[in-house]
């Protein structure tokens, strides 16, 4: 099963589609959702970038950074989830630029009024719309896809309605299964579909790292 999935992933990515924009990831940014889809943390762990197509995009993320306290100790600051929407038309690279976050005062200020910039490859600011993602769920494990779908349907500052129903009906992910094929459990198909999606977005180095990791996993 393992070898089959890895082989399929390689086949799906050759030839590799031409992408117009490289999103450079920051070590201080925990990416949660991209364009309405939950990010595959196992695939993107350690990745330097993600390839995007031209057009509108939406990121949901948290800023995670070690800050210094007044007693000379340190703690990990984690921001509330943020939503940023932008357009990559005619842009070949997107880079995060965060404000200074070194102490408790700066962290509290960021919580109250978050701000950041996205820069293109020439360090020119890209127009963005930034907002805080208000979490409505009281569950311990937050389903960020559901929260983002709700946000995008509510006409908020950084809402992009076209991503509101991207994952609303998982049955659309099964449309490529032939009626003659032996259909595996739906959860397995959805997992593979999501994995293929993120594999296609990852940069070549990340793909290679993931394939090496997958080869070392025990067969199911």
Curated annotation (Swiss-Prot):
- Leader sequence segment: 1-20
Keyword Cell membrane found: no
Q: Which UniProt keywords apply?
A: Signal
- Asked if the keyword Signal belongs to this entry, the reply reads yes
Q: Name one Pfam family in it.
A: DUF2057
Family per record? Belongs to the UPF0319 family.
Q: What is this protein called?
A: UPF0319 protein YccT
């Amino acid at each position: 099963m393992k070898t089959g999935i890895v082989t399929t992933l390689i086949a799906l990515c050759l030839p590799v589609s031409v992408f117009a924009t490289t999103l450079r990831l920051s070590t201080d940014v925990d990416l949660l959702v991209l364009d309405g889809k939950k990010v595959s943390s196992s695939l993107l762990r350690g990745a330097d970038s993600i390839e995007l197509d031209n057009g509108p995009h939406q990121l949901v993320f948290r800023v995670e950074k070690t800050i210094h306290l007044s007693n000379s100790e340190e703690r990990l600051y984690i921001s509330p989830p943020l939503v940023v929407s932008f357009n990559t038309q005619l842009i070949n690279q997107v880079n995060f630029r965060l404000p200074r976050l070194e102490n408790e005062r700066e962290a509290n200020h960021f919580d109250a009024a978050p701000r950041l910039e996205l820069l293109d490859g020439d360090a020119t600011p890209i127009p963005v719309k930034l907002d805080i993602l208000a979490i409505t769920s009281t569950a311990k494990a937050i389903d960020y896809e559901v929260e983002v779908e709700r946000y995008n349907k509510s006409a908020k500052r950084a809402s992009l309605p076209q991503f509101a129903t991207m994952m609303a009906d998982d049955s659309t992910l099964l449309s490529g299964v032939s009626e003659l094929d032996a259909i595996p459990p739906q959860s397995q198909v959805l997992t593979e579909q999501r994995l293929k999606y993120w594999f296609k977005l990852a940069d070549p180095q990340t793909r290679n790292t993931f394939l090496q990791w997958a080869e070392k996993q025990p067969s199911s």
